[in-house]
C-alpha cells in the first residue's frame, strides 16, 4: 500500500484519532468540530489554520485511501466523520497512540512520546514506547522511522511516514554548540519566527492545492 498524504490530510487524520480516543462522547465529529480540532493551538506542531474547504478536501483524500470517511450508521442530520485506520492496519492501542502524536506534533523522542501520549495510552516504561515504535517501523511498508541524532542532542527522534520519507535538515553549528544569543536580538528573532510560521502555513496550502490538482489526472 503506497501512502503519501498531504499535510492537511495528516492533520485531519491525527485530529480524528485523537478525538476518537480522548472524547468518545463527542465522536464522530461534524465538519465544524473537525476544523476546530485541526486548528487548536494545544498539542499541535505546527499550528495550522485550515478552513472548511481544506478539511473537506483532506477528508476526500483520506476517503480515497480508506483511512477516514462519513460515519456509518450515525443518527444525525449533520454529516459526521470518523477515522478508519483499524480497518486498514489493525493497530494495537500503543501503536495508534504513538502514531497519533507523531501525526499531530511531528518527530518526537521516546521520552516526549511517553509524556504526550498519556491521554491516549499509558506507557509504563520507555521500553514500551520503543516496542510500539518498532512495530510501526516493521510494518510493510514501514509507517515510522528513526531519524539521525542531531548534533548537541541526547536522543534521536522518530517520525511517521504517512506523508512520505522524512529528511531532517542539518542543524546550524551555532545551534549545536549552544552559543548564547544577544538579548537585543530577541525581538528580531521572534518576528522572524512568526514570519517563518506564516510561510509554513502558506506552503502547506500551496502543496495541498498542487496535490488536489495532481489527483484530478490520476
Per-region residue spans from a language model:
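Amphipathic alpha-helical oligomerization/assembly segments
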Residues: 179-216
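Helical coiled-coil/dimerization "stalks"
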Residues: 116-121, 147-162, 204-218
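A short, conserved structural fragment
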Residues: 56-59, 63-73, 133-150
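Eukaryotic, polar/proline-rich low-complexity intrinsically disordered regions
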Residues: 1-10, 22-25, 43, 54-57
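Residues in the recognition helix of alpha-helical DNA-binding motifs
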Residues: 15, 58, 132, 161
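Positively charged, polyanion-binding regions of nucleic-acid-associated proteins
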Residues: 6-25, 90-107, 133, 138-139
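Short acidic, hydrophobic short linear motifs in intrinsically disordered regions
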Residues: 23-49, 107-123
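Short, amphipathic alpha-helical interaction segments positioned at domain boundaries
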Residues: 74-112, 156-187, 191
Amino acid at each position: 500500500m503506497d501512502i503519501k498524504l498531504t499535510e492537511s490530510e495528516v492533520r485531519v487524520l491525527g485530529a480524528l484519532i485523537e478525538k476518537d480516543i480522548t472524547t468518545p462522547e463527542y465522536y464522530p465529529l461534524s465538519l465544524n468540530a473537525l476544523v476546530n480540532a485541526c486548528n487548536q493551538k494545544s498539542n499541535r506542531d505546527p499550528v495550522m489554520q485550515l478552513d472548511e474547504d481544506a478539511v473537506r478536501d483532506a477528508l476526500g483524500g483520506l476517503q480515497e485511501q480508506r483511512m477516514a470517511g462519513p460515519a456509518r450508521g450515525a443518527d444525525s442530520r449533520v454529516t459526521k466523520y470518523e477515522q478508519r485506520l483499524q480497518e486498514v492496519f489493525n493497530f494495537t492501542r500503543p501503536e495508534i497512540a504513538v502514531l497519533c502524536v507523531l501525526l499531530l506534533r511531528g518527530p518526537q523522542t521516546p521520552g516526549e512520546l511517553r509524556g504526550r501520549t498519556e491521554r491516549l495510552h499509558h506507557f509504563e516504561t520507555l521500553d514500551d514506547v520503543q516496542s510500539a515504535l518498532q512495530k510501526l517501523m516493521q510494518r510493510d511498508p514501514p509507517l515510522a522511522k528513526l531519524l539521525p541524532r542531531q548534533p548537541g542532542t541526547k536522543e534521536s527522534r522518530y517520525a511517521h511516514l504517512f506523508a512520505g520519507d522524512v529528511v531532517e535538515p542539518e542543524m546550524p553549528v551555532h545551534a549545536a554548540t549552544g552559543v548564547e544569543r544577544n538579548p537585543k536580538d530577541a525581538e528580531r528573532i521572534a518576528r522572524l519566527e512568526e514570519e517563518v510560521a506564516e510561510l509554513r502555513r502558506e506552503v502547506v496550502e500551496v502543496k495541498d492545492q498542487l496535490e488536489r490538482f495532481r489527483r484530478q489526472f490520476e
